[in-house]
Amino acid sequence: QHKDAIYKQDKGIKNYDNSVGYNKYNFRANIDANLTKSTIIELGLSTEIVTNSFPGYANDTKALWQTQANLTPVTVPVLYSDGSLPAYGASADQQNPYILLNYTGYKKKNETTSSIRLRLEQDFDQWIKGLKAEATMSINNYSALTQSQTKTPALYYAQGRNKDGSLNLIEKVAKTDDKYESTNL
């Protein structure tokens, strides 16, 4: 199962993959064998691999949808004419959806769940009528790896234009360097 998000992202801005999406792969195998007339063995294997990808600002896309819902198309430009990133809001520190998608980095979470089930059945009917024995063993494993490269871009508030026509920008949010994290579970 592969699902890409419907967001339009600029692929040329950065040198890493910040795509938003969900991938899920399932594998299942059941093997039953009669080892002898009185011995049956069953083996069940299953694995599920899930990869979730998000923008760097959060572990989901909720903030992106909230930001999008609170903005009209004319509230704030995607970018200022000089390429600076705009801030908006009462304290001029909020980011538009374009910035959240393209300038905050990425987070990827890979999860793997595996199960092995082994069942052995022995029929002792040849020695004692109706006697059977059964043994079952099961092993489950879960692992997760989360990797992220997050950052905050510099955001500016435009107070108008200077006499030469350039924007009069005030930095409202300072840029932070990339922060790399990796967590295993």
Residue ranges, per PLM feature:
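Flexible loop and strand-edge segments within Gram-negative outer membrane beta-barrel domains
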Residues: Q1-A5, N18-Q95, G105-E111, A144-T146
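Short loop/turn motifs that connect adjacent beta-strands in outer-membrane beta-barrel proteins
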Residues: A5-K8, S38, D123-A133, T146
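Extracytoplasmic loops and strand-loop junctions of Gram-negative outer membrane beta-barrel proteins
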Residues: Q9-N15, Q95-G105, K172-E181
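Flexible, surface-exposed loop regions and adjacent strand-edge segments
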Residues: G12-N18, A58-Q68, Q149-Q159, G165-L167
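Residues on the lipid-exposed face of transmembrane beta-strands in outer-membrane beta-barrel proteins
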Residues: A29-A33, I116-Q122
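Membrane-embedded beta-strand positions of outer-membrane beta-barrel proteins
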Residues: L43, L118, A133-A135
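Outer-membrane beta-barrel transmembrane domain signature of Gram-negative proteins
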Residues: P73-A87, K151-L185
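Phosphate-/polyanion-interacting regions in eukaryotic proteins
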Residues: E134-S143, G165
